[in-house]
Every structure is written in C-alpha cells, then in structure tokens.
Curated annotation (Swiss-Prot):
Full protein name: Mannan endo-1,4-beta-mannosidase
Catalytic center residues: 173, 269
GO MF annotations, alphabetized: cellulose binding; mannan endo-1,4-beta-mannosidase activity
InterPro entries, sorted: CBM10, CBM10/Dockerin_dom, CBM10_sf, Glyco_hydro_5, Glyco_hydro_5_CS, Glycoside_hydrolase_SF
Classification via PROSITE patterns: CBM10, GLYCOSYL_HYDROL_F5
Reaction equations catalysed: Random hydrolysis of (1->4)-beta-D-mannosidic linkages in mannans, galactomannans and glucomannans
Keywords per UniProt: Glycosidase, Hydrolase, Repeat
Protein origin, superkingdom: Bacteria
Domain CBM10: 357-390, 395-424
Family assignment from sequence similarity: Belongs to the glycosyl hydrolase 5 (cellulase A) family.
Pfam family, one: CBM_10
One Gene Ontology term from the biological process aspect of the record: glucan catabolic process
Amino acid sequence: MSLFTPLSETNVRSHTNTSSVFCRRIKTLVAGLTALGLMLAAVSASAGFYVSGKQLREGNGNNFIMRGVNLPHAWFPDRTNQALADISATGANSVRVVLSNGRLWSRTPESQVASIISQAKARQLITVLEVHDTTGYGEQTAATLSEAVDYWIAIRNALIGQEDYVIINIGNEPFGNGQSASTWLNLHRDAINRLRNAGFTHTLMVDAANWGQDWENIMRNNASSLFNSDPRRNVIFSVHMYEVYPNDTAVNNYMSAFNSMNLPLVVGEFAANHFGSYVDAGSIMARAQQYGFGYLGWSWSGNSSNLSALDVVTNFNAGSLTTWGNLLINNTNGIRNTSRKATIFGGSGSSSSSAGSCGTAPNGYPYCCNASSATGNGWGWENNRSCVVATTSTSCNWYGTSYPICVNTSSGWGWENNRSCIAASTCAAQ
C-alpha cells in the first residue's frame, strides 16, 4: 500500500481554497489586532493625570506642579467665568473650584460643572473640583464623604472623559478635630473604592484631617497605606496650611516628610493670615518650589469680612490685588514666576529645583541642568535620559531654584518669554 495518496485536481482546488480562506482570515485578524493596538496606544498616550513617586504627571509623562487659586463658585456662580479668565491671566496653571452637593448650599448641577470645565480648558487651566459641604464633618453639621461620592457619581457624565483636565478632590476638609486615624483612613478608602468601581480613573485628591491642617499628622502617618489601597495608585494628598504653620520649621517638617516618603503633596489651601493669626506663606511657597509640590492659594475673592485678608483681589476686581494677592502672585516663588501651563495646552510643562527641568533644546531633548559634555558631542545624561549640554549657560541655580538666563537683560532680573529671568552677571555674583 502506498504511503502517500496522490492529490487529485479536486483535492488541490479544495486545499487551495481552504488555504486562501485561512490566509484571508489571518490577514483580517492581524489587521484587527493592529487597529486595536493603535487605539490602545492612543489611549495610553493620553490617559489622564497619574502619579509617579511624588510627582503628578500628565498623560504624556510630563510633570505637572499646581500653581493656582481657589475659586468660590458655589457661593458666587455668576462671577465664575470672568474669574477664570482673570486667574489664568496671573499665569496660574490650575484652579480649585468650590462646588456643593446640596447638603449645606445650593447644589451645583451637572450642567454647571461641565461649563466650568469647558471654560477652564479655554483658559488653559487644570480644574480641581471639590465638594465643600463635607467641611469639618464630625465637629459641625456637614456632608459625609459617602454623600460626596454620591454627588460625583450623579454628575459622572460631566467628568468621565475629562481625565486629562480634571482632578477630583473628593471632599473639602472632611474631618474636623477629634476624629480617629482609622476613621480618616477607612472612610477615604471606601470613597476611593466606590469611585473606582463607578468607572472613575481620575487622579483623586484627599484632604487632611483636623480641618485640613493635619496638626495630629493623621494624613501624614497614613498616606502610604491609603495610597497603596487605591487599585490605580492615583491619589494625591492635600494639606491646608493656616495658623498651624506659622514658621519655616513647621512648613518644612511637614513637606519634607512627604518628600522622604516619595508621595505627592499639594498645599490645597493657604494664605498669609487666618483669623488674625500669621501664616508663613513665603516659606510655604519656597518649600513647595524646593520639593516640587503644588500649591493653591485661598481664595480669589468673596471671603466674609472677618476673613477679608484671605481675598487675592478685592471684590473680584483683577486690577485690585490685595497684600496677600501680591505675595501669592508676584513673590519670587509665587505663581507668576514659577507656574508652567500644562503641556496638553501647548505649555512647556512644570519645573522646580527638584524637578530637574532646565528647558528644552530645539531638537526636543531637555537641556542638561548639571551634566557637562563628558560623553562627547554635546550630550549628557540626567534623570535617566539623554540631555543636551548647552554651549553657553542657559539657566542659573539661584539659591536652589533654577531660572533661565536672560538674553536681553545685562544685570538684575528681567521678564522674557512670559517668565522671570536673571542676568548672567547677577547669577555669577551670588
């Protein structure tokens, strides 16, 4: 018996047709997988804000350091659109917006939230949204964190898809004094899990205990545990610095702890005065710049008469800066001198003395901050990537903060390319 069966013409045609169909199916499958891969690549290239170590990053991987102002929308909704334009004009890259879930004030409807986000985007501002009704829960009548989550889920259509532009601050100062660490931790953990299960992939911001000031260090001591409990590891921590932080020692002790833990911190509220007590706002801004942490000054305007010193401008008039507003915006470490617009708006991205950014060369690579041309051909290696060694100095390390060298100013300080710069001679003389 023959070991091989000869192929008839019919068998050959059948085999050929089967092979042809098989090949077409393979090609279709490959094309489908390729298209899926391209879609996934597009999504991953711009998947919203995320946390890497102590840094908040845009979807494209650029660091984003908040420099902005709080805006009391829930109490003055008719002022919001103009205020957003005025806040953006200060150079701010972000705005924290007061909303209400209806527990204490008029509920902010989903349509208003969508409009706020749209207006902020038009002004190149990243929006931090917060429910203010949770303020001081446990020590005064207030909404619970669970009620705040109910609100976020109810307005989810305004939020889903805005992950590149919106950060959700779950609840403002959601615990007063006298609350246990386990209460702060467990209720925040529950809130985060509910939001994740509801489809929210946004960066979530959580406020400290003790009316946000964390004088018992409840948030500081439990931040790592809460961060690791989030399945997305996409949480940033917000402390409100008022009279508990009257000097640089208090400010630095708190910020350096988060820096050592490699966890992201934002000063979600602060001012230079609180109910007549001094707050070391200068140190808050300087230390935030040193460590690469964000800050958001309280608040644009509209504070009650006993807190009018906390207004950045008088009566929502952008041309009338208060003493506090001038400090927040024009200080060496203030908004105008340190803010960088988000790159999703075409900005250059954020930098600080710790972020290691000294500008971008024409070829798209960063300029080296410290490397020499030891590797040859004008290239260096910093922050685990190649950098361009400038042929002439382009930046100055001014007492721990990096500033660009002015092109047209021969001495002192100048203003070029919409930011402060320092003359080479002044830098050399420090």
